[in-house]
């Protein structure tokens, strides 16, 4: 385990800007505690986990339950300074053995949503709305614990969030066809506090550091999946990776006055569709994918007229992408070109070469211009 541990609900670098932890990180920690208790009879408290980027936060347990053939543990989510609707929710994991050879099964308990439509991160309707990275984190930690005790990793993991169905009404889940509760989310495990000025300041500081080091190429990504895809191409030093997230405008406007030779913007299809539309803040609460815009792109790419209604009524941008891919139409390339035009327009002639990389949810590159 990494020797550098970070107490949960603390920002290790900026005490004035408190980071939080995702529902996925909380679910993983609760699952580790529950499985450990199921095997040993004792709950680790606090319980530490390793996040995808190597951080090791520790979480205090808010709930423990041990019964015949099952164990439960709960953690209260602290979103730090982010105005997250799930702040204060209790994330509970119940773990019990599954039949031999089953592997690890995830189920949605009270307050956790169920996927009913295609085009989401969980592609199979009927599955629990527990996204891929939290699933992987829980799977890896359960496999490691079971291996330590010489046991097969055949388990049922049920994640529940009391009050989650009410919380979900304040999210996009009902519109996306996720019913019954919230989603268990997160790609890094860390919730960055939503403070525009502070986040944008950190972007500016990152550009300043890169310039001071003589770095000629920087990367701004909307998330860890697209960042990893771009890094597989370039392997840039850490100081060349800007903490862009949803704030594409924060990167571009600062580079306009403080140019670096080359900028790569990498992001998922939906985020970069919004950039292509002209949005510079890509957060879901402040910009939305315009299905009419996507239809115009698809029509220019050769989509038949009878696809228009299906695109306009699509649930998500990813569903539109899959519809067009199914008939051999590429809209990721045109979206990348339009996103690049938005970036160049924002730079207003600054000497910055711009590259756009569009990825899918698995990190596969769909377009690169």
From Swiss-Prot:
GO terms, biological process: anaerobic cobalamin biosynthetic process; methylation
Entry keywords, A to Z: Cobalamin biosynthesis, Methyltransferase, S-adenosyl-L-methionine, Transferase
Catalytic activity: Co-precorrin-5B + S-adenosyl-L-methionine = Co-precorrin-6A + S-adenosyl-L-homocysteine
Protein name, per record: Cobalt-precorrin-5B C(1)-methyltransferase
Pathway(s) this gene product operates in, as recorded in its UniProt entry: Cofactor biosynthesis; adenosylcobalamin biosynthesis; cob(II)yrinate a,c-diamide from sirohydrochlorin (anaerobic route): step 6/10
Organism placement in taxonomy: Bacteria, Pseudomonadati, Pseudomonadota, Alphaproteobacteria, Hyphomicrobiales
Enzyme nomenclature, EC number: 2.1.1.195
InterPro entries: CbiD, CbiD_sf
Family stated for the protein in its record: Belongs to the CbiD family.
A Pfam family: CbiD
EC class of the enzyme, as a word: transferase
Entry-linked Gene3D superfamilies: CbiD-like
Organism per entry: Brucella melitensis biotype 2 (strain ATCC 23457)
GO MF annotation list: cobalt-precorrin-5B C1-methyltransferase activity
């Amino acid at each position: 385990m990494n020797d550098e541990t970070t107490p949960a609900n603390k920002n290790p670098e900026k005490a004035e800007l408190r980071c939080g932890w995702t529902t996925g990180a909380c679910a993983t920690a609760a699952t580790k505690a529950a499985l450990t208790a199921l095997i040993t009879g004792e709950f680790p408290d606090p319980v530490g986990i390793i996040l995808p980027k190597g951080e090791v936060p520790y979480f205090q347990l808010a709930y423990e339950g041990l019964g015949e053939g099952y164990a439960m543990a709960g953690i209260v989510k602290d979103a730090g300074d982010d105005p997250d609707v799930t702040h204060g929710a209790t994330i509970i994991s119940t773990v019990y053995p599954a039949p031999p050879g089953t592997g690890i099964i995830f189920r949605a308990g009270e307050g956790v949503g169920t996927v009913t439509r295609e085009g989401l991160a969980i592609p199979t309707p009927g599955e629990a709305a527990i996204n891929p990275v939290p699933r992987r984190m829980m799977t890896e930690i359960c496999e490691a614990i079971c291996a330590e005790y010489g046991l097969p990793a055949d388990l049922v993991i049920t994640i529940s969030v009391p009050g989650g169905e009410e919380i979900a009404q304040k999210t996009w889940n009902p519109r996306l066809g996720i019913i019954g509760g919230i989603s268990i989310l997160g790609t890094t495990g860390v919730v960055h506090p939503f403070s525009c000025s502070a986040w944008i300041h950190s972007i500016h500081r990152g550009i300043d550091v890169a310039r001071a080091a003589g770095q000629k190429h920087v990367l701004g990504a909307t998330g860890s999946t697209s960042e990893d895809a771009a890094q597989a191409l370039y392997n840039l030093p850490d100081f060349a990776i800007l903490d862009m997230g949803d704030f594409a405008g924060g990167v571009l406007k600062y580079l306009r006055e403080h140019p670096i030779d080359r900028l790569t913007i990498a992001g998922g299809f939906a985020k970069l569709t919004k950039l292509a539309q002209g949005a510079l803040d890509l957060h879901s609460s402040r910009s939305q994918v315009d299905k009419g815009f996507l239809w115009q792109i698809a029509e220019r790419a050769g989509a038949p007229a009878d696809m228009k209604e299906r695109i306009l009524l699509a649930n998500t941008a990813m569903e539109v992408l899959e519809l067009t891919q199914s008939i051999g139409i590429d809209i990721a390339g045109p979206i990348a070109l339009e996103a690049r035009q938005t970036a160049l327009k924002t730079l207003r002639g600054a000497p910055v070469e711009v590259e756009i990389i569009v990825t899918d949810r698995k990190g596969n590159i769909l377009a690169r211009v």
